[in-house]
Amino acid sequence: MNKYDRLDEITKLVNKRGSVRTNEIVEDLNVSDMTVRRDLAELEEKGVLTKIHGGARSNSAFQYKEMSHQEKHTRFIEEKRFIAKNAVDLIEDGDTIFLGPGTTVQKLAEEINHYSLTIITNCLPVFNILIKKQTLHFRVYLLGGEMRDLTEAFVGEMTNQLLSQLRFSKMFFSSNGVKDGLAMTSSIEEAYTQQIALSHSLEKYLLIDSSKIGKDDFSSFCELRELNAVLTDNNDLEKKEKIESYVEVIS
């Protein structure tokens, strides 16, 4: 096996398992310990993985360092726009909708152009887009509370009390990662607020680009089996198939 094939195999191993020990790579690829260590060092330099004691962990599978709203805003723009265009087709005049935080949901807000809707959100950037479209029949509400600087989403007791009194025909939301049939986020507070909204929504749709599939994060907040559908892109059919074992996928 040449070096480039070996690097490719190690990348596949660590991304599939999340983390892998050096001796496992030695056995799987039938190469020396020293060769594996050199390969891991090279892959770490390329940003593919992070070396840990006795092995390495995937930089694709772990998402514990949360990116800011601005950082996320510049990533996978076309994929998010593709997802948003599919999501807007699920919205009907007369719906009462909850929109969660996230840049993919923000793209959906840009696409919404209906005559008669009631939209509630706890995300300031989403609200700022929609409030410009408000009319007598197109009503937009922002739930207040404590704002998280990273995501510009309102959370906490005040937000949750307001949310607990409301009911929605549809909810559109995103997550930082999806793994083992669970949607995950970096904040317990955001997770709890999302759970309340989910429990008060008749139809529930998760919007995620395929880079998030297989990624772990700090707090899980819903099972994919509880959702009506997951909307994603077509960049990685293998990842999409993983989701299809739990829920309908729209792409």
From Swiss-Prot:
One of its GO terms (molecular function) is DNA-binding transcription factor activity. Pfam families: DeoRC, HTH_DeoR. One of its GO terms (biological process) is lactose metabolic process. Residues 20-39 bind DNA. Residues 3-58 form the HTH deoR-type domain. InterPro entries: Carb_Metab_HTH_regulators, DeoR-like_C, DeoR_HTH, NagB/RpiA_transferase-like, Tscrpt_reg_HTH_DeoR_CS, WH-like_DNA-bd_sf, WH_DNA-bd_sf. Coiled coil: none annotated. Keywords: DNA-binding, Lactose metabolism, Repressor, Transcription, Transcription regulation. It comes from the Bacteria. Repressor of the lactose catabolism operon. Galactose-6-phosphate is the inducer. This is Lactose phosphotransferase system repressor. The gene is lacR.
